[in-house]
Each structure stands twice: as structure tokens, then as C-alpha cells.
Amino acid sequence: MPETTTAPTPPDAAVEHLDVLIVGAGLSGVGAAHHLQTACPWASYAIFESRAAIGGTWDLFRYPGVRSDSDMHTLGYGFRPWTGAKTIADGASIRSYIVDTAAEEGIDRHIRFHHRIVSAAWSTPDARWTVTAERTDTGETVVVTCGFLLSCAGYYRYDRGYLPDFADMDRFTG
């Protein structure tokens, strides 16, 4: 995200400050939270998840036959090795692995569901991020500041598919 000096911390005392804000409660977000709370147990953090569940891709995609295309000994967590029967695991098993890991590590208590990031602006004078999120369940705007912002949001747009831009797209009829 571009650096700016035009977004100082809002003066409102009600703005929560976190040491770290993690975006996304999927495989990467849960893994990042584990490493953060292990290496920096003093750090305050939250995970903002736009959806209503832990698991990211593995929660969203539940079609028949969905599975990993990487072996779980590589894809899984080094701190909680995969013990499932299948090395190339099905989506439901991977989702359970992520959910169980979050619960066992106490990470689930840090997740704020229905929080979709709208903007993030770095303030050089304040040396912190100001992050604005929208509650997808209530429409409420939430503003927090943080020293570190970790994007673990994956690469899928859950709200719409990818639409490429190509010449004469408006004339394409199918």
C-alpha cells in the first residue's frame, strides 16, 4: 500500500490500537497468529475476517471433490504437523485442521468476523497504520490503528469473480 503522510491517527480516544492486525482467518492468517503469539507473547493483535467462519478458501469452496493440490506435509503447519490419513487432503479435512488449530492455540479468541477492510493508510508522523473496516453484518464502520499490518487474505475475490480487461470487451457476445 502506498505511503502517505496525510492520514494521521484519528484524535478519537475510542480508536483501538493493536500492535499487529492480521487480515484473513484462513491457513495463512492462523499460521501468522501462531508465530506472532509464540515469538511476541506481549503483542496485542486481532484478525479481521470478512466472512463468518475460519478457513478462508477451505471454508468457502465446498464443492464435491475439492482438495489440496499440494501435499499437506508441505502445506500444513510445521508447529502442528498434518496427521490426516490422506497426504493430498480433501477440503473438509483441511478446513477442520485450520479450525482445530485456531481453537487449540487460542487464536480463535482474536478473530473478529464480518470485518472487511475498506482502507489502510500509513502515517509517517505517527508511525502506524490507520485501518478502516466495514462490519459486513451490521454496516458499522470500525477504525483501528496498528504498528504492523499483515495481509493474509489470499488471492481470491470472494465477492466476485475475476473479469479480465481486453480490447472490445463490450462487443463480446459469448
Tell me what each language-model feature is.
Residues 1-17:
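A short, basic/flexible loop-to-alpha-helix module at the beginning of a structural domain
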Residues 2-5, 76-85, 90, 94-97, ...:
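Glycine-rich dinucleotide-binding loop and its adjacent helix/turn
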Residues 15-47:
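N-terminal Rossmann-like FAD-binding beta1-loop-alpha1 element of flavoenzymes
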Residues 15-18, 145-147, 174:
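Active-site acidic short loop of glycosyltransferases
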Residues 33-35, 59-60, 161-165:
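Short amphipathic alpha-helical segments
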Residues 42-44, 108, 173-174:
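A generic structural signal for alpha->beta connector loops
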Residues 52-100:
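Glycine-rich active-site loop/strand segments that organize a redox cofactor
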Residues 85-158:
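Feature captures the FAD/FMN-dependent oxidoreductase FAD-binding
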